[in-house]
Amino acid sequence: MSASRYIDALEDCKTADDLDPNNAKVLHRMAKIYTSLGRAQEALDVYDRIQPAATAKDKASAQNMQKNISQAEDTLKNSNSGSMVLHALDLAEKGLASTVQPPRKWRLMRGEAYLKMGTVNSLGDAQNVAMSLLRNNSADPEALVLRGRALYAQGENEKAIQHFRQALSCDPDYREAVKYLRMVQKLDKMKEEGNGHFKYGRYPQAVETYTSALEVDPLNKGTNSKILNNRAMCYSRLKQWQNAIGDCDRALQLDP
């Protein structure tokens, strides 16, 4: 069955369930369809209604799917390991029907995991996830912010700001869009201020501004590498050679 056929089959099961609420055969079929669509908790809720009780074998696929999704959510929240999130999502997706796309929530989680990894390839993968979601709905604020964050991590701050603003035009109350828009704008402003001090030979003020800019988003390796290079040039003009060397070393560690 195609994904749309699974949705149709689910609606048929719901209609049958309304007519005969305790029909175990209907409930088993409904639970299997929910699982095939990636709606594991709904499947488990249906299994709980079945009398006599559904067997462990019947429930195993939905339980494993829910366990892996919960693990992915927990790892996203409490760890910096994007690869562990991807592994959990891969395991969860094994329970989907072959013609069913992963749920939107899972795809956003995958994009978030790619952002956590922060490599050139993974940032491209995050962009691909966002673009796939935006092809389905160009006004998806979460997908717009996901793409904006990937662009920001790649140093494309102007494009990132455009995406955050577009997300806010879709949902003016979306806090993540506000958060990242303000952060990128603040960082750009401080970089420009530091560059202005450097241009006119105000090297101590430039060092101070660049130092403050490094505190705006410690996780953005690409941008912070550039700021460290700029601060290193200031230190060299001030003949603070060890500080200059230290910043160059740190910049290379962040962006080899």
Residue ranges of predicted features:
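Alpha-helical tetratricopeptide repeat
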Residues: 1-256
